[in-house]
Amino acid sequence: MAGAPRGQGGGGGAGEPGGAERAAGPGGRRGFRACGEEFACPELEALFRGYTLRLEQAATLKALAVLSLLAGALALAELLGAPGPAPGLAKGSHPVHCILFLALFVVTNVRSLQVSQLQQVGQLALFFSLTFALLCCPFALGGPARSSAGGAMGSTVAEQGVWQLLLVTFVSYALLPVRSLLAIGFGLVVAASHLLVTAALVPAKRPRLWRTLGANALLFFGVNMYGVFVRILTERSQRKAFLQARNCIEDRLRLEDENEKQERLLMSLLPRNVAMEMKEDFLKPPERIFHKIYIQRHDNVSILFADIVGFTGLASQCTAQELVKLLNELFGKFDELATENHCRRIKILGDCYYCVSGLTQPKTDHAHCCVEMGLDMIDTITSVAEATEVDLNMRVGLHTGRVLCGVLGLRKWQYDVWSNDVTLANVMEAAGLPGKVHITKTTLACLNGDYEVEPGHGHERNTFLRTHNIETFFIVPSHRRKIFPGLILSDIKPAKRMKFKTVCYLLVQLMHCRKMFKAEIPFSNVMTCEDDDKRRALRTASEKLRNRSSFSTNVVYTTPGTRVNRYISRLLEARQTELEMADLNFFTLKYKHVEREQKYHQLQDEYFTSAVVLALILAALFGLIYLLVIPQSVAVLLLLVFSICFLVACTLYLHITRVQCFPGCLTIQIRTALCVFIVVLIYSVAQGCVVGCLPWAWSSQSNSSLVVLAAGGRRTVLPALPCESAHHALLCCLVGTLPLAIFLRVSSLPKMILLSGLTTSYILVLELSGYTKVGGGALSGRSYEPIMAILLFSCTLALHARQVDVRLRLDYLWAAQAEEERDDMERVKLDNKRILFNLLPAHVAQHFLMSNPRNMDLYYQSYSQVGVMFASIPNFNDFYIELDGNNMGVECLRLLNEIIADFDELMDKDFYKDLEKIKTIGSTYMAAVGLAPTAGTRAKKSISSHLCTLADFAIDMFDVLDEINYQSYNDFVLRVGINVGPVVAGVIGARRPQYDIWGNTVNVASRMDSTGVQGRIQVTEEVHRLLKRCSYQFVCRGKVSVKGKGEMLTYFLEGRTDGNSSHGRTFRLERRMCPYGRGGGQARRPPLCPAAGPPVRPGLPPAPTSQYLSSTAAGKEA
């Protein structure tokens, strides 16, 4: 999901289950928690303060603006000489406080304000608010004052300064950036001071003083309760949003590491330009008729082929682990030499190693690089032979010319090179001599006489060179170039044959002695994080984050300086709230993106029930005040009872829906409607009290009677009821607007519209009544105070609503963006994993991705029974030709790519899921079955079942090639060899890791192909024994001479005895033998390639098996 952060501040119901708990701990769903919540780690707490700095700064500016406006309004009223009760200590202090608040406002408005400085400003503002509040208490400095009605009043009244203290208290909770405990202490001190001063200075003989003090105490309690709730919930929402964003950033960084690791792994297998192009097409396949070919042409490179002479005898004694270790040590060393000599290793085929210089980066001295590479390889293997007293040597062949490089097929990509010049380099290796670098005349011309050479006489040892009259030379090194000291073999007797373990040990020691070389474990260089300490700290922090139970005690990060925290710190330094606000509409604060706005509204408000409970408590407080000081009215009493009952019903309903896990029923529209109705209902109770207390019409004759309309339109004059508690009724109206502040997730726009309506009704009620003529109390003669109070309260609530809305929306935006980036990285990870699984067998790739780099060992696996298949197209070499008209052979390779791609698509079928493509070697396709590990309790398939799958695949390959011939008017013929037996699978080559299988089984399977007959499937006697029980039909071929094995009895697989393969395909001998065109349309024939039997480049006749890579794994004995 993009854009909706799971479990973010109050949104635990939308998105990932448990997301909120992960951020808030087990108690995260309670309405409010103990104060003083903060992270245990100072570093994380500092990050959170930095995260909220700009928003806290904006809130502080709003608080100082309200306080300045309050002090300024009171100062202006004093300046204009508004009548009122006897002057107290506040006389003359309001202008001073106004100046102080304005000065703090200017200081706070500095852009470069730091967290500590903002906290100091908040503390100063709280201190000045305390002095302001104390001076507003009902102290008396002078004698009796005269009311506007002319009546004498006491020296002070109990209601004096209450609304100012209520407003200052709420501002300290909702907008000032001070600690929660400090704000609570402020609220308690202010309330206690007013109550004590009132009790001490108001004349005790005033009737019902205790009732007035009780009403004041209830009002202070209500405001403090609402302030604490707003304070705690706002901070909790921000902390949860911060942790949610941090979790996403942590996951993103972890995924970034994994993706970087996967990218490095991908780059180690393929050149960057090829890998990036293939990755893009693999993830978003373009619509096209033909499969895209990833081939590039390089016209001036040098190709080196090298073969280890005598390796077969050395490896014949080894175990699986020893063989993989030996190969990795040798070829790891060769990879290091290739890097030093600016060569790129292309592939390892058995014990054959070939590389190219000048491929990825053009080099003018590519021939020199390859010669140096060949000489270094000879020196290396000579040192091995001397140290182990094993007859090992290296045969190296070089040629300079043109290559086509890239990847063929759709699965198990392997970078390779093709061209007639590659073929010639391969022949140069086969026609060379051990310990010599064999070069052609073309390569010699590129060396500019920098090396001494001698005639190679390659034509005397190779028919190919003799037929094409190719002159060859040997490089004559001037001296022994590189000697590997450090091995002492005095304890080993030369006459005694060494065991393989001894040979392997000495070989490993030898490989390590030069430049402290140690062959890397394959993929270890791409698995290791650059800073393991950072990774360890990140992992520790992650575990603690997931295991914490609360904010205050078990929160994360005992390890300071983690990578995630440093990353967030840099983000916060670059964060600009103004830019984030650009995503919001300035007036409505809605997101400009409709989809994001919809997802924001889908977040559930887990504190909505708590807000309703608080509204119920406030209604109960109004009921107590009504009973204490306000004249009772049946209408007001009924309204109060209805309000309490409705709120109780709402609370029960919300609790039931929450217990039954139906949070989705409270949509944003329902929550907004409930919020408006509850606020209007509670405010109506307070307004009803006001209506009952204020005189609505006075007779023109007397101030002591009230004119009302009776039934029938008659006017009735009633005696006026003294209502000294009208001030408390008006205070209830002010406090009645506070429920708007506790519904945090209701948008600010409906709140401000509702505030406007409530304020208007309040003013209308006051102006239409004669409230200035109410006898006694603080309202007597102070007509400005009720209007000033409601305007300041409404202004404060409007600013707070907008501030909370901005906070929640920016928190959501930050968390959503972090989660979107995390999800993007997750998609990249999955995409990279798909690509890696296309480069390596899935279980092998997963092994390296899951392994700890520090504990990673060589990957190897022994298998007792594996089916191996080689399928070649021997007459493709007759088809291949390099001409300007076909882009020097690219179009011919395009058709080969179509053939291999169709074979790959055939393997994608579910029936062939147990098959594993190993590689392609020129036009030879190599696959195996029985390599995948069995998962859990899944029954292991028998080798007979595996061989049936392999045989059916081979049969289907004939049909696929037959279809291609039909479409392209070609006559390609398939030749297949199958064998079964033990193999060793592993990954070798640290810098260019490569998965392969080795063993006598692989060699014999290759011989079954190379000694086979076109259009037939040749199998060994063991395969015949296992498959004849599965209704397959065979023809005995007889004894066949196999290199390294002598005479072997082989069979031709003809198909099933019932004429069908195991999944309904038919395999007919006549189709295999006659695959050429049968008429009809064409779809894939490359226009520039001849259909059959083209002349190969002059002087280069077709090779009998593979013109490209004659020194293949098929011809090597591992």
From Swiss-Prot:
Belongs to the adenylyl cyclase class-4/guanylyl cyclase family. One of its GO terms (biological process) is rhythmic process. Mg(2+) 1 binds at residues 307, 351. This is Adenylate cyclase type 1. The protein contains two modules with six transmembrane helices each; both are required for catalytic activity. Isolated N-terminal or C-terminal modules have no catalytic activity, but when they are brought together, enzyme activity is restored. The active site is at the interface of the two modules. Binds 2 magnesium ions per subunit. Is also active with manganese (in vitro). GO terms for cellular component: cytoplasm; glutamatergic synapse; hippocampal mossy fiber to CA3 synapse; membrane raft; plasma membrane; postsynaptic density; postsynaptic density membrane; presynapse. Induction: Expression in the retina oscillates in a circadian manner. It is a multi-pass membrane protein. Disulfide bonds: none annotated. Glycans are attached at residue 703. One of its GO terms (molecular function) is calmodulin binding. N-glycosylated. Residues 1105-1118 have a biased composition (Polar residues). SUPFAM superfamilies: Nucleotide cyclase. Its main location: membrane. Residues 492-519, 1023-1046 are annotated as: Interaction with calmodulin. Disruption phenotype: Mice appear grossly normal and healthy, but have decreased levels of calmodulin-sensitive adenylyl cyclase activity in the brain. They show impaired spatial memory. Mice show a significant reduction in daytime contrast sensitivity. Mg(2+) 2 binds at residues 307-308, 351. The gene is Adcy1. Pfam families: AC_N, Guanylate_cyc. Activated by G(s) G alpha protein GNAS. Inhibited by G(i) G alpha protein GNAI1. Is further activated by the complex formed by GNB1 and GNG2. Activated by calcium/calmodulin. Inhibited by the ATP analogs adenosine, 2'-deoxyadenosine and 2'-deoxy-3'-AMP. It comes from Mus musculus. Residues 1087-1104 have a biased composition (Pro residues). Its cofactor is Mg(2+); Mn(2+). Expressed throughout inner ear development.
